[in-house]
Amino acid sequence: MFTQKYFERGTDAKCFFRGHGTFGEIQGETERGEGVVFRRTDDYLLQCKYTMDAYGVCTRDDSIQNVSDRPLDLQEIKSRFVFEGGEYQVYTQYCCWQTESRGAWHKLTTAVSVGGASIRTNQNGAPFIALWSEQEQRGVAIHLLPNAAWEIKAERAHTLGKSTKLVVTLGISSYNFNVTLSPGEVLQMPKILCYEFKNKLDMDCYKLHNYLHIHYPRREMPIIYDTWMCCFDHLALENIMPQVDLAAEMGVEYFFIDAGWFGKGKIWSASVGDWSENTVTAFQGRMIEVADRVREKGMKFGLWIEPERAAPDSDSVKMHPEFYIRGDVESDQCFLDFANQEAREWMLGVIDELIERYGIAYIKDDFNANLYFDPYHTAFLQYQAGHKAFMKALRERHPE
């Protein structure tokens, strides 16, 4: 069903891509090179680059480049897999807080789809789909590594020839997506991992594990103590200091303070986004004493922050409304505009000050809220790229 020979079949670009824009619909004959299938016109260059490892895991990287001398509008761009017809089952997985990893097989009659519309790319759906051929008793697992809001759809289709095929279309969500590519500009589509399996129960997950061990070597994590796991947001010197002493006796290496240390009133949640110590509740301005005690006991001090979110009435939003995106009415939240470099630099400065003041050696960066509408109309492609740049800059400033 799926080997490297898959990419040597099919001559129509629709077998590998789906998209449209000011240039019309993506279609026409493809060409091939070493590890690449591509389609070049006067307007664009589409490339599907692929590799296959020793365990049968295929990595697919697709891109589209504007090769014309004028801007090109792009309303949709996705990757495609086309398989022979037959009777199929499709596996998808739901993912949400307290209801993670709820997966099931569905009989494919017309179409089965899954997607993630939020800036949190695993909200509502896991970016994963599996196919099972009832005739051949084998399947294909397909993982999407999102760089934007995304969608995956498996459907019976009669558009690529006279016989019905199984077509999987996946990539950046088409909702609220209208991107203009400047001459020479490249849009990188989400990376895809896929492999064949014969065990329907675990989908030969050892193949994925082997891939991850090679490309993302396991790190030994330190022993970390989180104050939330003891008493949630009840933070006071008389409550936390004994925990510091006991944690040190237990061999804890990092001791960090979770949510509730910041704000300007009794309800800290109303001040999310204002990352300065609360002088009314919690430690009442004396958190540095906790940090010093942690270090005296031979541990490293950490702090909880949530830089991407802010309450509408926070001082940060009032001071810099141009740095935030207003969420929908239901969420009643504002979101730092990571697509705005000036906003990113400002937040990096805020975190720099916290690290210097408290000697922070560990940050828990929580990501608790969902935003579903991208004002830039890129399905959060610019937002995610900005967030990645933000994290990279933070690590470069503070490699320790």
For each feature predicted by the language model, list its residue ranges.
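Short, well-ordered coil/turn segments that N-cap beta-strands
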Residues: 219-223, 251-253, 295-301, 359-361, ...
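Short Pro-Gly-centered flexible turn/kink motifs
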Residues: 179-197
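Short acidic, Pro/Gly- and aromatic-enriched capping/linker segments at domain boundaries
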Residues: 162-182
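Active-site neighborhood of glycoside hydrolase catalytic domains
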Residues: 284-286, 296, 316-400
